[in-house]
From Swiss-Prot:
Source taxonomy: Bacteria, Bacillati, Bacillota, Bacilli, Bacillales
Subunit field text: Homodimer.
MF GO annotations: ATP binding; nicotinate-nucleotide adenylyltransferase activity
Protein name: Nicotinate-nucleotide adenylyltransferase
Domain of life: Bacteria
UniProt keyword annotation of Ribonucleoprotein present: no
Organism of origin: Bacillus subtilis (strain 168)
Pathway stated in the Swiss-Prot or TrEMBL entry: Cofactor biosynthesis; NAD(+) biosynthesis; deamido-NAD(+) from nicotinate D-ribonucleotide: step 1/1
Annotated NCBIfam families: cyt_tran_rel (TIGR00125), nicotinate (nicotinamide) nucleotide adenylyltransferase (TIGR00482), PRK00071.1-3 (NF000840), PRK00071.1-4 (NF000841)
Entry annotated with the keyword Transferase: yes
Enzyme category, top tier: transferase
Residues that span the membrane, as ranges: none
Keywords: ATP-binding, NAD, Nucleotide-binding, Nucleotidyltransferase, Pyridine nucleotide biosynthesis, Transferase
Catalyzed chemical reaction(s): nicotinate beta-D-ribonucleotide + ATP + H(+) = deamido-NAD(+) + diphosphate
Membership in a protein family: Belongs to the NadD family.
Length: 189
């Protein structure tokens, strides 16, 4: 039985903060693999614009290819409409009944947990791992495991803005992702 961390996100674009967080959780929680799972449409972000899913998946492949413990899980890309974690986890549990799944969430999502769709049922299906982050309240009545990750203030929004304003993104995103963004004209004004 493998212990697998599911790391969902828009990854628009994937950045070194995502990779650092995944690597820290991998080792602190004693997991065998981290599966990066790009969202189709997160319910809490339905009114935002996203880069085409094809490009987000390609960038993610480039970002994780150097770590053999990092895999890509596209279950949410197979479905139309909003991506609810409960539906996704139910499907993954059916597909991988012999593996132990953990769902990784950032400190911002810990605060949002009470609003999650079918949360009580979800907590019976999967163990959550909360990633601590400065400035966010991580106390919760829910049974979460926690991981400490070194502070690395970077966000996909900031990186998109840097590309639009032609500011450097060195050391914020993997070089192969940067090259892909530039070659495909993503995030231009």
């Amino acid at each position: 039985m493998k212990k697998i961390g599911i790391f969902g996100g828009t990854f628009d674009p994937p950045h070194n903060g995502h990779l650092l967080m995944a690597n820290e959780v991998l080792y602190q929680a004693g997991l065998d693999e981290i599966w990066f799972m790009p969202n189709q449409i997160p319910p809490h972000k339905q009114n935002e614009d996203y880069t085409d899913s094809f490009h987000r998946v390609e960038m993610l492949k480039l970002a994780i290819q150097s770590n053999p413990s990092f895999k890509l899980e596209l279950v949410e890309m197979e479905r139309e409409g909003p991506s609810y974690t409960f539906d996704t986890v139910s499907l993954l549990k059916q597909r991988y009944p012999n593996d132990q799944l953990f769902f990784i969430i950032g400190a911002d999502m810990i605060e949002y947990l009470p609003k999650w769709y079918k949360l009580d049922e979800l907590l019976n299906l999967i163990q959550f791992i909360g990633v601590k982050r400065p400035g966010f309240h991580v106390e919760t009545p829910y049974p979460l495991l926690f991981a400490d990750v070194p502070e690395f203030e970077v966000s996909s929004t900031m990186i998109r803005e840097r590309f639009k304003s032609k500011k450097p993104t060195d050391y914020l995103i993997p070089d192969k992702v940067k090259k892909y963004v530039e070659e495909n004209g993503l995030y231009e004004s």
